């Protein structure tokens, strides 16, 4: 008799995705982040659901409802800080996952890669709207500044901004619709994740060598389930250390002040995981130019498969490309630091130099180095 997990229509899907899935025998811990992202998404949906039971999306009561969750709801503070710091863990895993994809050439699976970038945009939109909900100073002013960027779009810009605001400024209508979208988007993200996995399982996983591994595959369970559980334990230790010891380390102190449209904070800045893009936005003096640079800085990921010139897929055996990759990593970290600094000398010029370097590495240097490595290998 056939095992039920192989014959039952529903169990069969789970079996082919998580148990009997053929996986390359040599994938490293860099392949753990996919499962960690799935766990982060489930954690965010669960904690968010319980927070939504106590939160009110009204400008008069939003800030107080968050205070009420932290003070009066049983373990409400755990829910709130798990949700806030869970978002940070989500983005750490997300950026490492994308970095892995770039380093090992996983972007050559174009459908999986493109769905992944759409997922990135969706998660960024969700996180931005979530940051507005506590209705603190940085929530209000962050929402005002970022939504106002759309006014740079010629002709329809201002109409578009007022349409998103639901009035002539960020107010009750804005908060209500942001809460509605913040609640809805994670479920859309879950559906996109299914599509992401569907395309991935069409081709199978890449591996550190970048060479097809069809001749050497092992079942996902128990080998990689155990490996993923180890990754989960490490992530949960870091997350719980954050939540229980320094829950406000990654937040902004200004957000503990209720939103006040008459008082602007000295430095308006988004959460740390958007700072690199914010630094690129600020480094261009022109408003429309800045908005375009901001969008292109992330949308450029769509073009990475077409900028691949090397005959080798992975960077494992390409030391020159490795140097460029780590230069790009340090450049993004520099941009993250600059995004959190005030707009004054020398931060302006450092931000501009780092922004130019960011685009130069991806568009010009990486394809050139790929061609150069081909020549050096006499290919």
UniProtKB/Swiss-Prot annotation:
<keyword id="KW-0479">Metal-binding</keyword>
<dbReference type="InterPro" id="IPR005798">
    <property type="entry name" value="Cyt_b/b6_C"/>
</dbReference>
<dbReference type="GO" id="GO:0008121">
    <property type="term" value="F:ubiquinol-cytochrome-c reductase activity"/>
</dbReference>
<keyword id="KW-0999">Mitochondrion inner membrane</keyword>
<comment type="similarity">
    <text>Belongs to the cytochrome b family.</text>
</comment>
<dbReference type="InterPro" id="IPR005797">
    <property type="entry name" value="Cyt_b/b6_N"/>
</dbReference>
<feature type="binding site" description="axial binding residue">
    <location>
        <position position="182"/>
    </location>
    <ligand>
        <name>heme b b562</name>
    </ligand>
</feature>
<keyword id="KW-0830">Ubiquinone</keyword>
<keyword id="KW-0812">Transmembrane</keyword>
<keyword id="KW-1133">Transmembrane helix</keyword>
<feature type="transmembrane region" description="Helical">
    <location>
        <begin position="226"/>
        <end position="246"/>
    </location>
</feature>
<keyword id="KW-0472">Membrane</keyword>
<comment type="subunit">
    <text>The cytochrome bc1 complex contains 11 subunits: 3 respiratory subunits (MT-CYB, CYC1 and UQCRFS1), 2 core proteins (UQCRC1 and UQCRC2) and 6 low-molecular weight proteins (UQCRH/QCR6, UQCRB/QCR7, UQCRQ/QCR8, UQCR10/QCR9, UQCR11/QCR10 and a cleavage product of UQCRFS1). This cytochrome bc1 complex then forms a dimer.</text>
</comment>
<feature type="transmembrane region" description="Helical">
    <location>
        <begin position="288"/>
        <end position="308"/>
    </location>
</feature>
<keyword id="KW-0249">Electron transport</keyword>
<keyword id="KW-0408">Iron</keyword>
<dbReference type="Pfam" id="PF00032">
    <property type="entry name" value="Cytochrom_B_C"/>
</dbReference>
<dbReference type="Pfam" id="PF00033">
    <property type="entry name" value="Cytochrome_B"/>
</dbReference>
<dbReference type="InterPro" id="IPR030689">
    <property type="entry name" value="Cytochrome_b"/>
</dbReference>
<dbReference type="InterPro" id="IPR048259">
    <property type="entry name" value="Cytochrome_b_N_euk/bac"/>
</dbReference>
<dbReference type="InterPro" id="IPR048260">
    <property type="entry name" value="Cytochrome_b_C_euk/bac"/>
</dbReference>
<feature type="transmembrane region" description="Helical">
    <location>
        <begin position="77"/>
        <end position="98"/>
    </location>
</feature>
<dbReference type="InterPro" id="IPR027387">
    <property type="entry name" value="Cytb/b6-like_sf"/>
</dbReference>
<dbReference type="GO" id="GO:0006122">
    <property type="term" value="P:mitochondrial electron transport, ubiquinol to cytochrome c"/>
</dbReference>
<dbReference type="GO" id="GO:0045275">
    <property type="term" value="C:respiratory chain complex III"/>
</dbReference>
<feature type="binding site">
    <location>
        <position position="201"/>
    </location>
    <ligand>
        <name>a ubiquinone</name>
    </ligand>
</feature>
<feature type="binding site" description="axial binding residue">
    <location>
        <position position="196"/>
    </location>
    <ligand>
        <name>heme b b566</name>
    </ligand>
</feature>
<feature type="transmembrane region" description="Helical">
    <location>
        <begin position="178"/>
        <end position="198"/>
    </location>
</feature>
<feature type="transmembrane region" description="Helical">
    <location>
        <begin position="320"/>
        <end position="340"/>
    </location>
</feature>
<keyword id="KW-0349">Heme</keyword>
<feature type="binding site" description="axial binding residue">
    <location>
        <position position="97"/>
    </location>
    <ligand>
        <name>heme b b566</name>
    </ligand>
</feature>
<feature type="binding site" description="axial binding residue">
    <location>
        <position position="83"/>
    </location>
    <ligand>
        <name>heme b b562</name>
    </ligand>
</feature>
<dbReference type="GO" id="GO:0046872">
    <property type="term" value="F:metal ion binding"/>
</dbReference>
<protein>
    <recommendedName>
        <fullName>Cytochrome b</fullName>
    </recommendedName>
</protein>
<feature type="transmembrane region" description="Helical">
    <location>
        <begin position="33"/>
        <end position="53"/>
    </location>
</feature>
<feature type="transmembrane region" description="Helical">
    <location>
        <begin position="113"/>
        <end position="133"/>
    </location>
</feature>
<dbReference type="InterPro" id="IPR036150">
    <property type="entry name" value="Cyt_b/b6_C_sf"/>
</dbReference>
<feature type="transmembrane region" description="Helical">
    <location>
        <begin position="347"/>
        <end position="367"/>
    </location>
</feature>
<keyword id="KW-0679">Respiratory chain</keyword>
<comment type="function">
    <text>Component of the ubiquinol-cytochrome c reductase complex (complex III or cytochrome b-c1 complex) that is part of the mitochondrial respiratory chain. The b-c1 complex mediates electron transfer from ubiquinol to cytochrome c. Contributes to the generation of a proton gradient across the mitochondrial membrane that is then used for ATP synthesis.</text>
</comment>
<keyword id="KW-0496">Mitochondrion</keyword>
<keyword id="KW-0813">Transport</keyword>
């Amino acid at each position: 008799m056939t095992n039920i997990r192989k014959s039952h229509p529903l169990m069969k899907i789970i079996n082919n995705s998580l148990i009997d899935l053929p996986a390359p025998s040599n994938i490293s811990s860099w392949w753990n982040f996919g499962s960690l992202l799935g766990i982060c998404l489930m954690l965010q949906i669960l904690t968010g659901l319980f927070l939504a039971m106590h939160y009110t999306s009204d400008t008069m009561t939003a800030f107080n409802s968050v205070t009420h969750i932290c003070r009066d709801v049983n373990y409400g503070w755990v829910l709130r800080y798990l949700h806030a710091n869970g978002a940070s863990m989500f983005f750490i895993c997300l950026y490492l996952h994308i970095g892995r994809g770039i380093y090992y050439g996983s972007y050559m699976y174009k459908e999986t890669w493109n769905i992944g970038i759409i997922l990135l945009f969706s998660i960024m939109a969700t996180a931005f709207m979530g940051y507005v909900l506590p209705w603190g100073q940085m929530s209000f002013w962050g929402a005002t500044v970022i939504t106002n960027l759309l006014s740079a779009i010629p002709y329809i810009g201002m109409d578009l901004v007022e349409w998103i605001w639901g009035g002539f400024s960020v107010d009750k209508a804005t908060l209500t619709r942001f809460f509605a979208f913040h609640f809805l988007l994670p479920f859309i993200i879950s559906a996109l994740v299914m599509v992401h996995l569907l395309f991935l399982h069409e081709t199978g996983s890449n591996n550190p060598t970048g060479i097809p591994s069809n001749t050497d595959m092992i079942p996902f369970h128990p080998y990689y389930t155990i490996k993923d559980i180890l990754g989960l334990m490490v992530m949960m230790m870091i997350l719980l250390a954050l939540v229980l010891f320094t829950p406000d380390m990654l937040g902004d102190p200004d957000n503990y002040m209720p939103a006040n449209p008459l008082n602007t904070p000295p430095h308006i800045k988004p959460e740390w995981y958007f700072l690199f893009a914010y630094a690129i936005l600020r480094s261009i003096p022109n408003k429309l130019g800045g908005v375009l640079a901001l969008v292109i800085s992330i949308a450029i990921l769509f073009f990475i498969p077409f900028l691949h010139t090397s005959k080798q897929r992975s960077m494992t055996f390409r030391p020159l490309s490795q140097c460029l990759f780590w230069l790009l990593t340090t450049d993004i970290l520099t941009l993250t630091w600059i995004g959190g600094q005030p707009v004054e000398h020398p931060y302006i010029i450092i931000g501009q130099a780092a922004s130019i370097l960011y685009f130069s590495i991806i568009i010009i240097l990486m394809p050139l180095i790929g061609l150069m490595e081909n020549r050096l290998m006499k290919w």
